[in-house]
Regions:
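Conserved ATPase-coupling elements of RecA-like P-loop NTPase cores
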Residues: 3-11
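Residues immediately C-terminal
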Residues: 1-4, 42
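Conserved H-loop
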Residues: 37-39
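C-terminal regions of RecA-like/P-loop NTPase motor modules
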Residues: 9, 21-31, 42-126
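Non-catalytic scaffold segments within catalytic domains of secreted glycoside hydrolases
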Residues: 14-18
Length: 126
């Protein structure tokens, strides 16, 4: 988390909560979407299933509470180099205040820094 709060707070968690509330207020006041990025806690590294969850958001539950939409990117080949899912990135919708949850897989073309829908690369079944 690179942002800092305005006032004196007792912990980084309180500071992140203040920032989160401020971003939410800004979005409402200006009627615009605000995109905020956050690091995950290291808890992901300690467990078997490495897919991120809402509880992995670092330093504050207020990020989860204030957000209308929380999404994660997950690449299995980052943790499992021998996986069959090489270059596949899963876009996970973990929270959606006004819609469904779910995930979609994309092919990540590193040389172009580009995500491409997998349907372009799948062979039709006959």
């Amino acid at each position: 988390q690179l942002m800092q709060g305005r006032g004196r707070v007792e912990s980084r968690q309180q500071e992140v909560s203040e920032i989160s509330r401020g971003l939410k207020a800004l979005a409402r006041e200006l009627s615009v979407p605000v995109l905020a990025l956050s690091q995950l806690s290291r808890a992901v590294e300690q467990r078997q299933n490495k897919k991120p969850t809402l509880s992995d958001l670092r330093e504050s539950g207020s990020l989860e509470q204030d957000a209308d939409l929380v999404c994660f990117l997950y690449r299995e080949d980052y943790y499992e180099p021998e996986t069959e899912k090489k270059k596949i990135t899963e876009f996970i919708i973990a929270k959606h205040r006004n819609g469904p949850l779910g995930s979609v897989e994309f092919l990540f073309q590193k040389e172009y820094s580009k995500f491409v829908g997998l349907e372009r690369f799948r062979k039709p079944e006959n």
